[in-house]
Structure formats: C-alpha cells, structure tokens
Amino acid sequence: MQRNQFLVSSIVGTLVAAAGNTFAMPPDILQPFYLPPAPPLEPGPGGLDIRTWVRSTQTNNQFSCIEAAVAPKTMGPPPHLHKALDEICYVLEGTASVLVGDKIYEVQAGGFHLRPRGLVHTFWNASDKPLRFMDLYFNQNFEEYLEELFHQIYADMAKQNLTPLDPTIAKRMAALDKRFGVTMFPEQRQAIVDKYGLK
C-alpha cells in the first residue's frame, strides 16, 4: 500500500511540476517588442548614415536590421564581401544601385534585393534624390559592425580630421573587418565613383 501511495505521489508530483513548467519562459524564447515610428533618417556629414532598428540581442542573434540614408550622387562602401552574412535590402525611398559581381541592379522604392555571402558587392545613389533603405541581417550581429564604424571610427576621423589611410584608423578598420568576416576591395572603388560621377 505504501509503495502504491509513493508511486501515485511521485507521478502526481511529476505531472504538477511539468504543468507548472508549461508556462515558464526559458531565457532563449523570444519576447514580443514594439518599435514606434521615427522621422526618416537623414544622410550624415559624409553623405551616409545608419540607424539601428532591430538589434540582434532582441532576437537571439537570429535577425537585426538598420535604416540607411545616402545623399544624392554618393558612393557607398568599397566593394566587399562577407564570409558568413546574407543581407536583404528593402528600399524605402529613391533608387539604390547595387553591384553584385559584375551585375548592377537598380532597386526602386518598394523593391527588395538579396546580397548573398561570399559575393563581392557594393551600392551607391546615382540619382539626384535621397536614398533610404532598410538592410536586414541574419544570424550575425552586423548592426554592431556598422555602429562601431559610423558612430565611433568615422566620428573620430571627423574630430581629428583624419582619413581612412591614417595608420591608426586603418588599423581599427582592419580589426573591425576581421572580427566580422568582411573582406574589402578598396582598389575597385574609384572606378565606380568616376564612372557614375559620385562623391
């Protein structure tokens, strides 16, 4: 009899504990969040700027996204590739010229474009109107790369009147690229600037 009572107590205890855990939220379960609207982003002093919307820390490193603003006739980054990052661009305003390999895509407002990992790519604004787009990143905290580049390295360059060729700046940028698996091809940039009359 005591054995039966022990078994019943054990089973009931296990079921109660399991039922209690049904409503517990493990730390890796995503929580809902809301992001209110914000005024459109304006290009910064160098003709580009970024603003983070969704952080990778909010999505267990599954997803993040930023808004980018590019002034008219402005070149984006040098051609580059990502070792492990796929990017999706959604254009909010204007037209993004996106180079992947040797093909150029003209992505108008409302259009999407995928830039897969391992392919050399860049973008620019060839028009006389502002360009704004959202960049979506998967399985990498790439918003942190951009925040460090735009809001720390570029900010320090402006304060100290330095260029990317300054040894201190070049070292910081190379370390940042290495940390995030980015390979730059700066020697390919000027030909694009010259061909499309960009800044």
Task: Identify what each model region corresponds to.
Residues 1-14:
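N-terminal secretory signal peptides and thylakoid transit peptides that target proteins
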Residues 21-53, 199:
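C-terminal segment of N-terminal export signals and the immediately downstream linker at the start
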Residues 42-79, 85-86:
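A short glycine-rich, His/Asp/Glu-containing loop-to-beta-strand
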Residues 67-71, 81-98, 136-137:
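Short, conserved beta-strand element in jelly-roll/cupin
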Residues 71-75, 110, 118:
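Tight coil/turn sites that cap or link beta-strands
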Residues 102-117:
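Short acidic-glycine-tyrosine-enriched beta hairpin
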Residues 117-144:
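Ligand-binding loop in jelly-roll beta-barrel domains
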Residues 152-199:
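Acidic/histidine-enriched, glycine/proline-rich intrinsically disordered or flexible terminal extensions
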